[in-house]
UniProtKB/Swiss-Prot annotation:
The active site is at residue 138. It catalyses: NAD(+) + (deoxyribonucleotide)n-3'-hydroxyl + 5'-phospho-(deoxyribonucleotide)m = (deoxyribonucleotide)n+m + AMP + beta-nicotinamide D-nucleotide. It comes from Cyanothece sp. (strain PCC 7425 / ATCC 29141). This is DNA ligase. GO terms for molecular function: DNA binding; DNA ligase (NAD+) activity; metal ion binding. The gene is ligA.
Length: 738
């Protein structure tokens, strides 16, 4: 072939490549536009068959020419490989929670507070007298923080504790109403969008039907289903569940937010906030790379929350269509009343109304408390109630032998779900209600999750209604039950009780204990009912042949179960101790105890005084441990576990409690609110183990206040005294650093 022919071929190939590149870009634009119209605007512009043809053509070209594949392509929403874990990430701008209101008086008090704050900072009285509010539905889902760099989605994270969340980008990319690339020419270098991921009701009901047919446990409500879906390690499962997303907040992080090692208040880090006071400084802080970017960003910045929502919609997001501008608090009340009655007609769950001051300038001036923005509030719906009839009262027996009475109800719709059971807690609650079988009762969902009986109508009690008394014998094993002194709980003390055995094994195989994959409640029930397992030690004697006698058990699955059980033999001593299910010994306490007593022999030989000497371990825990090891059946269990090869010691040398590291020695802590992952006892134990002291009230002697959700007056007092506040993650960091 001549040089001329070579050159002609090269030119022809280059032309073909250019043509293909152009076609790929064209297909991406078509598919993205069609997806936006379908998933965001709910106004399809292409027939499904045409969309599928275009999508497949794009997919084929990207496979044939992998150099043309980019992360923002619509074909890249779902990855092929499941993740192994989620990584903790710090939010550039914190995700604040909202203050809650439950009545008109709460809303009026909130308005009075922000108006007083406005007067204190010199805000014009006309602005304070005539505010404008934006009302939005409070979607009952999971909050997400999305980060875009140069217009491309690079990170999706959960809310977490508001400072740290989990990176779930692969899962976020599967949500079709979240754009992979913003429809924003010359966007700012970094754009952050906050919103709510949720499961539409029709998808939720279909998902539960599929789970029921597969013999899997049902999701309690769409919120739990959405949260559980987002935490799936396999994005392919997430994609199948068809989550949706509404955006409600736009942030344009300044350079200071991108370089900060500790999060600051949102108004100090966001261009939209800073620009309300000094647009020139804000544009300078953005580090814009071109004049066109500067003009595009700084000349079209929203001045109001309403404009922010409109901009979010313009750049590709779905924004809730039921938002409304309200000139007065009276208009806000009308909006609330409308949706309080009309919420069940929506195709998704809501749990209230979010009310925000419309002016971004006023938002910036009012700022934040340590927990909430002063310029926004969540007006929660009243818990939905319903009247129904008690058909029967049954009793559940837990792993500790506790008998919990449960009311069996005539099925009724409550907060969007069918309710047929309600907990009665214990003997004292039964006595307080004076409940009879046949009574008409009012039920509600505590926190709109757990059904419980709120009120009994004795005047409507039928003549044949029967009073109820807790059984004197265990309904599972028939042995007499006891009422421990100073406890409202009635207990079965038979360690061979099937319910206690099942509960103990389910606890043992759980994620925080031995983490035995493939062994769930249904399999445990079969194993106990068939007499194959009577204690956790029996798990380690199971064979494939025995498992094959169970329902829905094939050879491959049986081999996996046996392998998973064998793998658990190497779990550390701290997990074993927690897995034993000793009352009051949580996972954190177990770690503390196994540090002080690095073998089961050392712990068995310890007195209550020895155990109580460990920082963070109180007399109740110490006595519970001593009593557990004094029981002959538990001695036998330890011997069987040892023979099975389970780790009952750790390699470290025992350290006397008095010589354990005490990095927080001399520091006094107070706990308030609900922490994301730790219980109060676990946090108290960790602080005590490190030498710190936890007290119940805030004073000048308090060094740190550890703050969780729904913190109370302790937070206000700490603010008045200038006491530093820590989130759970900051407490854990402090413990790790020291």
């Amino acid at each position: 072939m001549s040089n001329l022919e070579h050159e002609a071929e090269r030119v022809e190939m280059a032309a073909a490549t250019t043509e293909i590149r152009q076609r790929v870009l064209e297909l991406r634009q078509l598919v993205q536009r069609a997806s936006y119209a379908y998933y965001v605007l709910d106004a399809p512009i292409l027939e499904d068959v045409v969309y599928d043809q275009l999508y497949r053509e794009l997919q084929d070209l990207e496979t044939q020419y992998p150099e043309l594949l980019t992360p923002d392509s619509p074909t890249q929403r779902v990855g092929e490989q499941p993740a192994t874990q989620f990584v903790s990430v710090q939010h550039r701008i914190p995700l604040y929670s909202l203050e809650n209101a439950f009545a008109v008086a709460d809303m009026q008090a909130w308005q009075d507070r922000w108006q007083r704050q406005g007067q204190a900072i010199g805000e014009q009285s006309a602005t304070l007298r005539s505010p404008e509010y934006v009302c939005e539905l409070k979607i009952d889902g999971s909050a997400l923080a999305l980060t875009y760099e140069n217009g491309v989605l690079v990170r999706g994270a959960t809310r977490g504790d508001g400072v740290y969340g989990e990176d779930i980008t692969a899962n976020v990319r599967t949500i079709r109403s979240i754009p992979l690339r913003l429809d924003w020419p010359d966007p700012p270098p970094i754009v952050e969008v906050r919103g709510e991921a949720f499961l539409p009701l029709d998808v939720f009901h279909r998902l539960n039907q599929e789970r029921e047919q597969a013999g899997e446990s049902l999701f309690a409500n769409p919120r739990n289903a959405a949260a559980g879906t987002l935490r799936q390690l396999d994005a392919r499962i997430v994609a199948k569940r068809r989550l949706d997303f509404f955006a409600y907040t736009l942030h344009l992080p300044l350079a200071s937010a991108r370089s900060a090692t500790q999060p600051a208040a949102a108004q100090q880090l966001d261009l939209l906030a800073v620009a309300q006071s000094d647009p020139a400084v804000a544009a300078q802080q953005l580090d814009l790379s071109s004049a066109s970017q500067a003009e595009s960003v700084t000349t079209h910045l929203p001045q109001t929350q309403w404009q922010s929502l409109e901009l979010l919609q313009q750049i590709g997001f779905r924004v809730n269509p039921h938002r409304q501008l309200c000139p007065t608090l009276a208009d806000v009340r009308q909006y609330y009343d409308h949706w309080n009655h009309g919420r069940l007609d929506l195709p998704y769950m809501t749990d209230g109304v979010v009310v925000k001051l419309n002016s971004l300038r006023l938002q910036e001036h009012l700022g934040f408390t340590q927990k909430f923005p002063r310029w926004a509030i969540a007006w929660k719906y009243e818990p939905e109630q319903a009247v129904t009839e008690v058909l029967n009262i049954s009793v559940n027996v837990g792993r500790t032998g506790a008998l919990t009475p449960v009311a069996e109800l005539r099925p009724v719709q409550l907060a969007g779900t069918t309710v047929s059971r309600a907990t009665l807690h214990n003997r004292d609650r039964l006595a307080e209600l004076d409940l009879h079988i046949g009574d008409k009762v009012v039920i509600h969902k505590a926190g709109e999750i757990i059904p419980e009986i709120l009120q009994v109508f004795p005047e409507l009690r039928p003549a044949d209604a029967r009073p109820y008394q807790l059984p004197t014998h265990c309904p599972e094993c028939g042995q007499p039950v006891v009422q421990p002194v100073d406890e409202a709980v009635t207990r079965c003390l038979n360690v061979s009780c099937p319910a206690i055995v099942r509960g103990a094994i389910v606890h043992w195989v759980g994620r925080d204990a031995m983490d035995i994959d493939g062994v769930g409640e249904k399999l445990v029930r079969q194993l106990v009912d068939r007499g194959l397992v009577n204690s956790v030690a029996d798990l380690y004697r199971l064979t494939v042949a025995q498992l094959l006698t169970l329902e829905r058990m094939g050879n491959k699955l049986a081999e996996k179960v046996v392998a998973a059980i064998a793998k658990s033999q190497s779990r550390p001593w701290s997990r074993v101790l927690y897995g034993l299910g000793i009352r009051h010994v949580g996972s954190v306490n177990a770690q503390v105890l196994t540090t002080a007593f690095p073998s089961v022999e050392r712990l068995m030989a310890a007195s209550a005084e020895d155990i109580e000497a460990v920082h963070g371990i109180g007399p109740e825990i110490a006595q519970s441990i001593v009593q557990w090891f004094q029981t002959p059946a538990n001695h036998s269990l330890i011997e069987q576990l040892s023979a099975a090869g389970v780790q009952l010691a750790q390699d470290t040398v025992a350290v006397p409690p008095s010589q354990l590291p005490q990095p927080l020695a001399g520091k006094t802590f107070v706990l308030t609110g609900t922490l994301p992952t730790l219980s109060r006892d676990e946090a108290r134990s960790m602080i005590g183990q490190a030498g710190g002291k936890v007290t119940d009230s805030v004073s000048k002697k308090t060094d740190f206040l550890v703050v969780g959700a729904d913190a109370g007056s302790k937070l206000d007092k700490a603010g008045q005294l200038g006491i530093p506040c820590l989130s759970e993650s900051q407490l854990l960091e402090l413990l790790e650093e020291t």
